[in-house]
Swiss-Prot record:
It comes from the Bacteria. The lineage of its organism: Bacteria, Bacillati, Bacillota, Bacilli, Lactobacillales. Its cofactor is Mg(2+). Belongs to the phosphohexose mutase family. It comes from Lactococcus lactis subsp. lactis (strain IL1403) (Streptococcus lactis). It is an enzyme of class 5 (isomerase). This is Phosphoglucosamine mutase.
Length: 452
């Protein structure tokens, strides 16, 4: 990670850390880096989620892109994977998404996709950062001829919807489904897609006002959806996050089905169809021990990466795997798209239910999840989170807790990729043990580097 770019683009509090001035620079310098070798006029797609700051940042970013001669196509409010899909399909030079995903409305972010639809490599991000930090802006400044033009590309959302529907390979007639679009980007597509696929729908989190994105709705707050599933007697609920690159489901009983369980369900189905490349699923260090045991029993190999969907995708590309994801709900189907896609994942999950004739609770019951506890400790700043593992007291308590578990569980302490948080996670055979381990470590972390 560089000075400005984290694991998922540039993030910060809108108009405080991520300012219009920074957005302009990212547009100008990012656009130049991504299009400097184009033979014709470069074309860049820009999308955003529903945050109130999205229009402000989009205006500045687009101005920066236009200033270096780039033709900009404004997609408006669209899911992050929609930008990635359209860039690759239409042969655009690059794409930019303005979103802070599952973060609250006061935050925003800017992430770039290359012409191949994948997130930028570290080298390209460092090149952009070097231009931002240079003492002088030496990039071309055309005055009339050579400036870019801005085009509305609202039909891009409809193209993305059409693509999603083709992946269902049939319809979902007879299924009662609750959708939760998190008052976010999926509100422009999810209802239309699943209605066209003939599901019987109830939709919540579909009234964005610029401030309510992810507030008590969406994949990080599936409780409202779970309640609605039970109330309506639905077959399942499908919750997306603010930019709709994640999916968390709930079964017909209102029980949460997280990314681990969804990956197992879909991975096992793909294996049975001979469509799981190298019989392997790529996941991260956050995936539950019970998930790995279920994979082993099903005859599925697993490859484990660092946390972050970009690392899952890197591993998949490097070794030609086609399915992977994270416990948090990012799932990547490289046969269909280049990045995590919540709506695509939802369609694939429903497809497994349709093809097997099984309920979601029945499919999910094959994975026995170890009790897991995750606590996010807010620390003083990003420097504190990065150096946390060098603090002797923190090292000592982790070592003591690992010894006490005697190999029957695991501990993971890591910095957040996007916020000043230290994530403390443990798994153990019992809730009592996992609570003791996490609470003991959290107490020391808060004392040493926590926000007082």
């Amino acid at each position: 990670m560089g000075k400005y770019f984290g694991t998922d683009g540039v993030r910060g509090e809108a108009n405080v850390e991520l300012t219009p001035e920074m957005a302009f620079k990212l547009g100008r310098f990012g656009g130049y880096v991504l299009s400097q070798h184009e033979l014709g006029t470069p074309k860049v797609y820009v999308g955003r989620d529903t945050r109130i700051s999205g229009q402000m940042l989009a205006s500045s970013l687009i101005s920066g892109l236009l200033s270096v001669g780039i033709e900009v196509y404004d997609l408006g409010v669209i899911a992050t994977p929609g930008v990635a899909y359209l860039v690759k399909k239409d042969g655009a030079s690059a794409g930019v998404m303005i979103s802070a995903s599952h973060n609250p409305a006061l935050d925003n972010g800017i992430k770039f996709f290359g012409g191949d639809g994948y997130k930028l490599e570290d080298e390209k991000e460092l090149e952009i950062e070097a231009l931002i930090d240079a003492e002088e802006d030496t990039l071309p400044r055309p005055s009339a001829q050579g400036l870019g033009m801005l085009h509305d590309y609202i039909e891009g959302v409809r193209k993305y919807q059409a693509f999603l529907k083709t992946t269902a390979e049939g319809n979902f007639e007879g299924y009662k489904v609750v959708l939760d679009t998190a008052n976010g980007a999926a509100y422009t597509s999810a209802r239309a897609v699943f209605a066209d696929l003939e599901a019987n729908l109830t939709v919540i989190g579909e009234n964005p006002d610029g401030l309510n994105i992810n507030v008590k709705v969406g994949s990080t707050h599936p409780e409202a959806m779970a309640k609605k599933v039970v109330e309506t007697g639905s077959d399942l609920g499908l919750a997306f996050d603010g930019d709709a690159d994640r999916l968390i489901a709930v079964d017909e009983n209102g029980e949460i089905v997280d990314g681990d369980k969804i990956m197992f369900i879909v991975g096992k189905y793909l294996l049975g169809q001979g469509k799981l490349a190298q019989d392997t699923l790529v996941t991260t260090v956050m995936s539950n021990l019970g998930f790995h045991l279920a994979l082993e029993e099903a005859g599925i190999n697993s490859v484990i990466t660092a946390v972050g969907d970009r690392y899952v995708v890197e591993e998949m590309k490097k070794n030609n795997y086609n399915f992977g994801g994270e416990q948090s709900g990012h799932m990547i189907f490289l046969d269909y798209n280049t990045t995590g896609d919540g709506q695509l994942s939802a369609i694939q999950l429903l497809k497994v239910m349709r093809e097997t004739g099984k309920s979601l609770s029945e499919l999910a019951s094959e994975v026995t999840i170890y009790p897991q506890k995750l606590v996010n400790v807010r620390v003083k700043d990003n420097a504190a989170k990065k150096s946390a593992m060098d603090v002797p007291a923190i090292q000592k308590v982790i070592s003591e807790m690992e010894t006490s578990m005697n190999g029957k569980g695991r501990i993971l302490v890591r910095p957040s990729g996007t916020e000043p948080l230290l994530r403390v996670m443990a798994e153990a055979p019992t809730h009592e043990e996992v609570n003791h381990v996490v609470d003991t470590i959290v107490e020391v972390v808060e004392a040493e580097i926590g926000v007082k």
